[in-house]
């Protein structure tokens, strides 16, 4: 089931909210868990056992770790637990990648398994691993109630595409959370904002990308239009989902971590990754980079740590070489910045912004490429290589047709609208008017989104494939 679907908006969500708030306090987690299982199993119930197995592995492993008599036993059990928890992810997502590359290297013809990847497995696996490691470290106590732990992992607002919510983020709220009209109103506002990002901006930019892919008259201009459109689409698609997740979490009394903070306004790649998919970056920092020694090691080991972490980050996104190269590209850029470039970028902010936008755009072309060869063809075409025309009549038509949505997306990817709204609210006599206008705008946006959905087709979020 999708957040951006009529089934969810008209039927599931209202029923879920009604049953949840009618349920007594001690039953709310059970209602949330049952609703989440219905949400997850709506389209593909065959994947419910996979999620249940990962949840059970996480729950039982920490109970076993708690019985260990010494540190050595705990470490062995921790390693076994993490391997057990991550096995379904490796098997479902990466088995065919390893088989394909083994066949290429050895000349064998081992048949591919062709396993469909369970929705959200990359996200809920990382949540369970973080919980296991945190309990082992003594950062959080083990959750003794299996239903409460299952509700934490399977909670539908953040289940299929994050943010990656750590147990420590919401531990107290799982046991006792506060509900209020103000928090619920905030949640609705965030949800409608995210839904609008997805339906009214990301999906429309997706139409332009569809025209590019179907076109037989591609030009240099059209390649740049595609690259910019995809860069904006993936931001509004993913940040829109994160807004909806944070909003739904607030409706049910939870405070989920933010996942985006205007990443395209960054002046360095280091800053970009502090603003983009923040929960994933923090996960790799705390559970891979720091345990490897972080930067408190010899230079050669530090470089190795950087490359390993970013190769893993790329590989997490997909079982293909273009994702690995995408991660390694950022490893190289971050090493250059940390070695000598950062002081220069801090003094020359404009150059820093342009540098970030250029490499992030090139990175997303690699990210979206069907293969490394396809990526190279795109780059050559973007810079006028081969026999490609600079511009065609068809491409100009699409530029005129989508110019407004591209400009809207560019402005929306910056904090300018929020800052303008904040300044207007501070003016005397305007706050009440703006509050009413905001409510009316949100209602209009919601109705417009529903109208688009009624008239539209299946529109999954881009990050569902990861």
Segments predicted by a language model, with ranges:
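Membrane-embedded transmembrane alpha-helical bundles that form the catalytic cores
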Residues: 1-465
């Amino acid at each position: 089931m999708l957040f951006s679907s009529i089934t969810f908006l008209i039927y599931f969500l209202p029923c879920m909210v009604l049953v949840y708030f009618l349920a007594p306090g001690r039953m709310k987690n059970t209602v949330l868990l049952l609703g989440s299982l219905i949400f997850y199993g709506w389209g593909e119930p065959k994947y419910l056992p996979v999620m249940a197995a990962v949840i059970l592995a996480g729950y039982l492993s920490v109970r076993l770790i708690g019985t260990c008599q010494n540190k050595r036993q705990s470490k062995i059990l921790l390693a076994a637990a993490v391997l057990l928890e991550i096995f379904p992810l490796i098997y479902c997502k990466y088995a065919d990648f390893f088989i394909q590359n083994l066949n290429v290297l050895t000349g064998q013809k081992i048949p591919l398994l062709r396993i469909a990847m369970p929705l959200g497995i990359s996200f809920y696996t990382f949540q369970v691993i973080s919980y296991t490691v945190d309990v082992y470290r003594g950062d959080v106590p083990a959750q003794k109630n299996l239903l409460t732990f299952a509700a934490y992992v399977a909670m539908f607002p953040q289940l299929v595409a994050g943010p990656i919510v750590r147990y420590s983020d919401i531990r107290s709220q799982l046991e006792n959370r506060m509900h209020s009209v103000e928090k619920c109103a905030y949640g609705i506002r965030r949800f409608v904002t995210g839904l609008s990002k997805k339906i009214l901006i990301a999906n429309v930019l997706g139409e332009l990308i569809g025209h590019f892919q179907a076109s037989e008259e591609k030009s240099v201009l059209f390649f740049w239009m595609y690259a910019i459109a995809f860069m904006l689409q993936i931001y509004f698609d993913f940040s829109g989902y994160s807004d909806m997740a944070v909003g739904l979490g607030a409706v049910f009394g939870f405070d989920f971590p933010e996942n985006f903070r205007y990443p395209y306004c960054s002046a360095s790649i280091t800053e970009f990754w502090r603003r983009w998919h923040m929960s994933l970056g923090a996960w790799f920092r705390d559970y891979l980079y720091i345990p490897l020694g972080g930067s408190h090691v010899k230079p050669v080991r530090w470089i190795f740590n950087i490359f390993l972490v970013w190769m893993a980050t790329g590989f997490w996104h997909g079982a293909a070489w273009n994702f690995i190269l995408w991660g390694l590209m950022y490893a190289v850029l971050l090493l250059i910045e940390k070695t000598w470039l950062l002081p220069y970028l801090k003094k020359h902010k404009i150059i820093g912004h342009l540098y970030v936008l250029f490499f992030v755009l090139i990175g997303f072309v690699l990210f979206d490429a069907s293969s490394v060869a396809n990526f190279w063809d795109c780059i050559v075409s973007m810079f006028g290589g081969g026999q490609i025309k600079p511009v065609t009549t068809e491409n100009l038509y699409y530029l005129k047709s989508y110019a407004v949505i591209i400009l809207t997306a560019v402005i929306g990817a910056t904090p300018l609208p929020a800052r303008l709204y904040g300044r207007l609210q501070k003016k005397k006599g305007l706050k009440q008017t703006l509050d009413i206008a905001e409510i009316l705008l949100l209602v209009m946006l919601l109705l417009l989104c529903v109208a688009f959905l009624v008239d539209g087709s299946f529109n999954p979020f881009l990050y569902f494939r990861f």
